[in-house]
Curated annotation (Swiss-Prot):
This is Contryphan-Li1. Transmembrane segments: none annotated. The modification 4-hydroxyproline is found at residue 57. It comes from Conus lividus (Livid cone). One of its GO terms (cellular component) is extracellular region.
Amino acid sequence: MEKLTMLVLVAAVLLSAQVMVQGDGDQPADRDAVPRDDNPGGTIGKIMNVLLPSGCPWNPWCG
């Protein structure tokens, strides 16, 4: 009975090690990627970038 218990424990350890090595095959490669913020100012910043492409609301003083 002790040999059977040891065999079951060894099989469980090997199986868990195999699962850890293989990992999740169905997950995309970029699951940890952070989406890039193209408009850090939000909607207002996007509108201002269209209206004033230089990004400066005071055109004469922006050099």
